[in-house]
């Protein structure tokens, strides 16, 4: 075959490795000389196919080798050519021919044929391109089926996973870099010369087979040809992977291998199932791969499934590795990132959807990490009563919440905190009490099924150990003043000794320590133990820095806020509806008009924790009213200022963790600069906002102006948006290591330019310049006709129909040095950027955090102002009462409406008037009436008005005059907890007991149909007992008691502060089947339930309706006769003068017919 036009006579190319079978002479493994030893009589070529008929490119390491673009498979003539041709050697140079001949004489025919086949398979892959992997895929499927019994990997799973179009990857037959290094290291002993590796293979080892055959043999566990052993022989890479798995048990590892991210072993099987990707055997381990650019997407999916995911990176760079003494050993790999659902920190480019899977549907807030510690209360009469300490961290926002509380058998207090804090991961001690275990299991589920991930700690430290661990953590970070003595570690010290020491430190902390240390040493004991567990856990994720900022700490229990328990959140549909379990139709859906992510998160905190401080409530209401009216020009600009802001709270958190990119840093600083420039402190006198709260937060925005501009002036915004860390800083002297690396690269660039002048002279082309193709730089491109003029020592990289591209030896040498300087520059730039962000957060975090917090507050106030503009909303008027006075809270609401129903319902809502604990009304209402008459709707509207008023919102009423409540307790509905072993009645009674144990005279209590979960007799007795208990308290709370037990109405005679009321209706007949008309208005007195009417409307069969009506009439007559008999008996048992009409009326009222 004639040589191609671009090939110089005597110049080597890939075509020279082929020869027809008829003219082929026997060859040996050592038939090819080392490239470094080839004389100048032979030009060097790349490993890819030279062609003049189409574009072809080659990527030199560290770039990945490209393949031929064979979309329709190899052409027929190419396949025919492969069947006719075999490999033969280039003629070696004279100086090595004698050595090669000697080695050839020592090779056996079997070794020669095996080596020929290995070379044949390698070049066949190069010729056929990606379609060569098809046959291997078929064999891989057979191997997976064979290994399924050992790995529990079913055939159906593998078949399903290969159907994924987005993430399923074609198996690449290219050897991994580490595997190539393994083969080179194994063959770098005296022996014959190998054409493909450039190294000699030992004569004592068998001839190497193709990668395909080697993979299959190792996967099936077949012994080597030499019979050295019967078990699997692990490569250095596989040994490294097994060591990593042993070091990190329970972690699903994603390992960087070359330019790929891979799962191995059982992790590959799990990833194949969870991600719907292909799993295939590779040597001794199952393997699955994902694209590098979709790492964050797949990590999210895995952690949402409840897995703990680790990312193992190569910490050595290619250029520096090649220049080191360990060039032929595996890359050093370490766990560089660890993720769970609670520790995942999204970047600013991700969509801010708080209702997505990474948030919680119950509270629509970011998931948190919670540590729970409990301790039995000694000396308590109830053996199952415990003290519980918790610490919860939201890593996306930096908020850290702590609390310690006493809880009963039902663990309702723990349930309330879980509902508010919405943990995605919970750390618990090795053992908990059975009631606590049941509550956690019922509420949090199983992480493996997509629920909350529960991690049980190996051991729980006592207070002594926890205190020493926490104080050491803060002392090591320089957060403790030198005057504060170090906590000694006394092996025999008791918990009481450490407690006394902690108390001593706390007493003097205000004068000698930072505010953070003062807070830490004053934490409750169980909370401190939980904090120690949180810090230790976060250190593995490199997120512990969030615990070093005092502004992030807050107590869950506060005297200035109202605590809504989990039942109230569910029954009043605060965050989600009861039926659809969606946000639409909930209170948060009605109020959320925020424009920023920070504002939406803060609004949820306001709604879940209404204020009890009347002065703060007045401040909020003044601000909402001012924003609603919009009289000030400053207030009218707020809406445009807040529009389009990124999630600055999350951005600051990423900066604190050291995970922010230059683009995110620029985004945060530019957004803060735009906000702080909008309001100037020296113009505050002209704002006239009529709200001290708004003025305070506007001044807070202005206070961050100088800080933001200082750091903005140090960086280049253009380079930051391009994520260019090397050219990010305007002052090059700030980070000299960067400039030194740049200078070294500039020297190499100068030598490359000087070498280019030499090439121009050699080729007589004054305008010649380097070109870059497919990621390969510094290519010398010449026309095909001139290709024969280039020196033979140039390396031919790629060719097209018209052009041929080369690398000169000097270019390759200088490129290697330049790559080393480039990687040094990248490392220096990374360290400089981390230092820049670290110093920014250390010195100015509080200022920037205050600016972001003020933006969130203004956003929430604007949202409430938008709600206040709706028709029929009024500003609530709070009635002041002495804080220490034991008195019921007055409530007077005129024209009260259900704020949500009037929006979602097509029918107009009927308003009602409610008054409690006022001069003309008592503290309790006994509410009866028809089924579907609107009883539950009225009490829900009452609860919503109180909550909306105490978060600082206008309310849906004509007039609202209320006092400040410290809690709203709502018990409604019937439900069981089968998985926790609690029946409907047990749940009902337990929730009622929790309310009775927590209420005060300043609480609002709403009980709906108590006692329905058992027999009528027992239910009536329970309802009567609970109602009487509430009425006989020294200072009874405001109570609305819904019931169908009309006998309870008699209590009004004994307790004047109880009023009987019902939902009105109209009816023209006493026939149970005649229609009634519901009025939906509150009226004094009692009323029947009309349950048979409701059953008739529900379309029960008429036969059942008639039967029920007959039974009801009989029971009514029987009870009426018994009541009349009791009246007459009482009348004749007393003197005639007492048997007056009033006495008869009293007796009839005491025993009314039901």
UniProtKB/Swiss-Prot annotation:
ATP binds at residues 929-936. Residues 21-60, 183-195 have a biased composition (Polar residues). Residues 228-342 are annotated as: Mispair-binding domain. It holds the Pfam family MutS_III. Keywords: ATP-binding, DNA damage, DNA repair, DNA-binding, Nucleotide-binding, Nucleus. GO terms for biological process: mismatch repair. Residues 1-119, 172-233 are annotated as: Disordered. Its main location: nucleus. Residues 69-83 have a biased composition (Basic and acidic residues). GO terms for cellular component: nucleus. One of its GO terms (molecular function) is mismatched DNA binding. It is found in: Nucleus. The keyword DNA damage applies. Belongs to the DNA mismatch repair MutS family. MSH3 subfamily. Component of the post-replicative DNA mismatch repair system (MMR). Heterodimerizes with MSH2 to form MutS beta, which binds to DNA mismatches thereby initiating DNA repair. MSH3 provides substrate-binding and substrate specificity to the complex. When bound, the MutS beta heterodimer bends the DNA helix and shields approximately 20 base pairs. Acts mainly to repair insertion-deletion loops (IDLs) from 2 to 13 nucleotides in size, but can also repair base-base and single insertion-deletion mismatches that occur during replication. Heterodimer consisting of MSH2-MSH3 (MutS beta). Forms a ternary complex with MutL alpha (MLH1-PMS1). This is DNA mismatch repair protein MSH3. It comes from Mycosarcoma maydis. The gene is MSH3.
């Amino acid at each position: 075959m004639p040589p191609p036009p671009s090939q110089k006579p005597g110049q080597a190319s890939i075509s020279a490795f082929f020869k027809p079978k008829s003219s082929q002479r026997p060859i040996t493994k050592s038939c090819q000389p080392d490239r470094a030893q080839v004389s100048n009589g032979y030009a060097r070529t790349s490993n890819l196919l030279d062609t003049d008929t189409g574009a072809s490119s080659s990527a030199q390491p560290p770039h990945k080798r490209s393949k031929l673009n064979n979309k329709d498979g190899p052409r027929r003539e190419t396949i025919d050519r492969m069947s006719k041709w075999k490999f033969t050697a280039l003629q070696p140079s004279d100086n090595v021919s004698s050595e090669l001949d000697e080695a050839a004489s020592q090779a056996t025919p079997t070794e020669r044929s095996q080596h020929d086949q290995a070379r044949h398979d390698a070049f066949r892959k190069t010729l056929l391109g990606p379609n060569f992997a098809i046959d291997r895929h078929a064999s891989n499927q057979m191997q997976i089926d064979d290994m399924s019994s050992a790995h529990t990997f079913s055939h159906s799973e593998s078949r399903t996973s290969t159907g994924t179009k987005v993430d399923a990857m074609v198996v690449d037959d290219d050897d991994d870099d580490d595997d190539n290094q393994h083969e080179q290291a194994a063959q770098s002993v005296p022996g014959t010369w190998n054409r493909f590796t450039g190294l000699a293979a030992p004569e004592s080892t068998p001839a190497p087979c193709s990668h395909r055959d080697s993979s299959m043999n190792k996967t099936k566990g077949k012994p080597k040809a030499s019979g050295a052993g019967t078990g699997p022989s692990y490569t250095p890479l596989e040994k490294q992977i097994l060591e990593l798995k042993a070091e990190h048990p329970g972690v699903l590892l994603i390992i960087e291998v070359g330019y790929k991210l891979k799962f191995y072993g059982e992790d590959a099987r799990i990833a194949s199932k969870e991600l719907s990707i292909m799993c295939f055997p590779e040597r001794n381990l199952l393997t699955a791969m994902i694209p590098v650019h979709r790492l964050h997407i797949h990590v999210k999916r895995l952690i949402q499934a409840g897995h703990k995911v680790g990312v193992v990176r190569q910490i050595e760079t290619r250029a520096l590795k090649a220049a080191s003494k360990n060039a032929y050993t595996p890359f050093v790999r370490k766990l560089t990132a660890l993720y769970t659902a609670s520790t995942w920190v999204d970047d600013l480019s991700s969509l801010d959807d708080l209702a997505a899977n990474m948030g919680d549907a119950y509270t629509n807030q970011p998931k948190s990490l919670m540590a729970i510690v409990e301790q039995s209360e000694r000396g308590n009469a109830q053996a199952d009563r415990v003290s519980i300490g918790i610490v919860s961290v939201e890593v996306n926002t930096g908020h850290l919440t702590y609390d310690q509380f006493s809880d009963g058998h039902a663990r309702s207090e723990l349930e309330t905190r879980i509902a508010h804090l919405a943990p995605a991961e919970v750390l618990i001690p090795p053992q908990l009490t059975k009631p606590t275990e049941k509550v956690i299991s019922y509420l949090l589920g199983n992480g493996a099924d997509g629920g909350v991930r529960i991690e049980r700690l190996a051991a729980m430290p006592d207070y002594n150990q926890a205190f020493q661990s926490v104080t050491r953590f803060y002392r090591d970070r320089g957060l403790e003043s030198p005057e504060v003595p170090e906590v000694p570690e006394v092996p025999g010290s008791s918990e009481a000794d450490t407690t006394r020491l902690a108390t001593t430190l706390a007493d003097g902390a205000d004068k000698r320590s930072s505010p953070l240390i003062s807070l830490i040493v004053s934490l409750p004991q169980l909370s401190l133990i939980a904090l120690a567990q949180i810090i230790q856990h976060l250190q593995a994720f490199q997120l512990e820095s969030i615990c070093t900022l005092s502004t992030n700490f807050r107590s869950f229990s506060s005297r200035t806020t109202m605590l809504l328990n989990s039942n109230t959140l569910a029954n009043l549909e605060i965050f989600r509806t009861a039926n659809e379990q969606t946000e639409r139709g909930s209170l948060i859906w009605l109020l959320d008009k925020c424009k920023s992510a920070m504002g939406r998160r803060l609004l949820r905190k306001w709604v879940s924790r209404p204020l009890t401080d009347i002065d703060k409530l007045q401040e909020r209401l003044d601000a909402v009213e001012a924003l609603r009216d919009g009289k000030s020009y400053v207030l009218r600009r707020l809406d445009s200022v807040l529009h389009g802001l990124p999630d600055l709270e999350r951005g600051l958190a990423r900066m604190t963790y050291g995970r922010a990119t230059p683009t995110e840093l620029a985004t945060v600083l530019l957004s803060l600069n735009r906000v702080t420039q909008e309001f100037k402190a020296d113009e505050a006198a002209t704002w006239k906002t009529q709200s001290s709260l708004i003025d305070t937060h506007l001044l807070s925005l202005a206070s961050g102006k100088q800080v933001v501009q200082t750091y903005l002036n140090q960086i280049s915004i253009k380079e930051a948006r391009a994520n260019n860390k090397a050219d990010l800083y305007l002052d090059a002297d700030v980070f000299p290591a960067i400039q030194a690396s740049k200078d070294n690269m500039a020297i190499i660039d100068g030598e490359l330019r000087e070498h280019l002048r030499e090439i121009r002279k050699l080729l007589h082309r004054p305008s010649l310049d380097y070109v870059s193709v497919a990621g390969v730089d510094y290519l010398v491109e010449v026309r095909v006709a001139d290709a024969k003029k280039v020196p033979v020592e140039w390396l031919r990289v790629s060719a097209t129909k018209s052009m041929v591209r080369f690398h000169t030896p000097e270019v390759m040498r200088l490129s290697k040095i330049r790559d080393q300087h480039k990687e040094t520059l990248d490392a220096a730039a990374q360290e400089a950027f981390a230092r820049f962000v670290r110093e920014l957060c250390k010195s100015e975090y509080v200022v920037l955090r205050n600016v972001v917090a003020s933006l969130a507050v203004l956003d929430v106030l604007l949202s409430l102002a938008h709600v206040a503009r709706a028709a029929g909303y009024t500003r609530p008027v709070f009635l002041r009462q002495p804080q220490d006075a034991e008195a019921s809270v007055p409530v007077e609401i005129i024209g009260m409406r259900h704020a949500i129903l009037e929006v979602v319902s097509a029918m107009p809502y009927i308003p009602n008037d409610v008054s409690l604990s006022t001069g003309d009304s008592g503290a309790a209402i006994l509410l009866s009436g028809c089924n579907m008459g609107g009883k539950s709707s009225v009490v829900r509207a009452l609860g919503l008005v109180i909550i909306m008023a105490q978060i600082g919102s206008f309310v849906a009423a004509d007039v609202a005059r209320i006092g400040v409540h410290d809690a709203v307790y709502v018990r409604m509905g019937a439900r069981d907890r089968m998985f926790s072993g609690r029946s409907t009645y047990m749940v009902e009674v337990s929730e009622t007991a929790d309310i009775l144990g927590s209420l005060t005279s300043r609480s609002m209590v709403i009980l709906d149909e108590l006692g329905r979960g058992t027999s009528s007799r027992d239910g009536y007795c329970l309802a009567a007992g609970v109602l009487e208990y509430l009425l006989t308290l020294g200072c009874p709370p405001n109570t609305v008691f819904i019931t169908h037990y009309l006998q309870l109405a008699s209590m009004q005679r004994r307790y004047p502060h109880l009023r009987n009321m019902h939902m009105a209706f109209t009816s023209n007949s006493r026939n149970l089947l005649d229609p009634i008309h519901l009025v939906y208005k509150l009226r004094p007195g009692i009323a029947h339930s009309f349950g048979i009417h409701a059953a008739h409307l529900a379309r029960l069969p008429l036969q059942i309706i008639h039967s029920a009506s007959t039974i009801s009439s009989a029971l009514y007559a029987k009870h009426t006769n018994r009541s009349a008999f009791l009246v007459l008996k009482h009348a004749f048992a007393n003197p005639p003068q007492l048997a007056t009409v009033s006495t008869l009326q009293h007796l009839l009222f005491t025993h009314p017919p039901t």
